[in-house]
Amino acid sequence: TRSLFHKEYAAENRSIENDLEAVSFLLTDCQLIIKNFDTFFLPDNEAITSFLRGANPERIAWISPDHSSVNQEGELLDRNGIPVSFHRESSSKIQIRSAGKDRVMWTSDDVVYPDRKTLSKAN
């Protein structure tokens, strides 16, 4: 059976914001299930995606090996085919960024999760 992530990530009826939120939920699951998650060296997209595909102590694959949004380099792609950017802000907080419709990272149309609106709702 396919996971909910497999069915919904980059699906036509969802948005980039939904996709990034789904990735954030997977990372939260990792933090809850994998002992000492904060000690793992996960510096980039490839390392994080590998971890989410089962290269972790529990061998849990949150992202299936054949997911269409993972490229040959093992990077998770956004719905525009651009590798997602992960920025580990602390031991428990990872910011996730999509290049947006212009397909260029670090421009004004990038989609970031959590964004300032999400953070202000939480406070």
Give the positions of each predicted feature.
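Amphipathic alpha-helical segments typified by the pilin-like N-terminal helix
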Residues: 1-18
